[in-house]
Amino acid sequence: ELEHLACPEFINHADCVNCLNANRDVIAGVKVLLSAALADDGRNEAKAFREALQAAVTTATPLMTHHAQSTISIDECPGSMRAGDIYTHCYHGFESTIIDPQSRRVHPAVRAARTRGVLFDIGHGMGAFNWTVGEICAEEGFWPDIISTDLHTGCFEGPAYDMPTVMTRMLHLG
């Protein structure tokens, strides 16, 4: 299996912009998957994030980031994101979680991003929902703007199952 961002030559701003502009009827924005394991041990993550953000700016579309087990700091992502951009899998419990490891509170850069208008999405999926993160966020009133399943073949038999299951988890949090 090829890592998503293993080869830097696959990260191409111009091709992304051209593809998006040619398919505006079906493409709503740009998504970048930031995970060290899928980016040559993180070596290509910074370039991928920069190029994706620039492509979104160039095309005046939102950027969606998957930022889990990433070498990109929480200060940079969602710190560099714009109003209307989407930070998905916001309740994951992996490295680069939105919870500051020292204070065990929502990271100040995350709060600043929300104030700027960055949207936060559950994106439950296979392993992107962590009860401890959810409980901390609930205690602090940091609720997602979007509740989505991120349903795919790896999680329709659990843990996400379907939208009612994801919604029930959110209701359980408060």
What do these predicted regions represent?
Residues 2-14:
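Active-site mouth loops of central-metabolism enzymes
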Residues 3-5, 96-97, 158:
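Acidic/histidine-rich helix-loop elements
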Residues 5, 76, 169:
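Generic anion/oxyanion-binding catalytic loop in active/binding sites
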Residues 11-120, 128-145:
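Histidine/acidic residue-rich metal-binding segments in metalloenzymes
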Residues 130-174:
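His/Asp/Glu-enriched, well-ordered alpha-helical/loop segment
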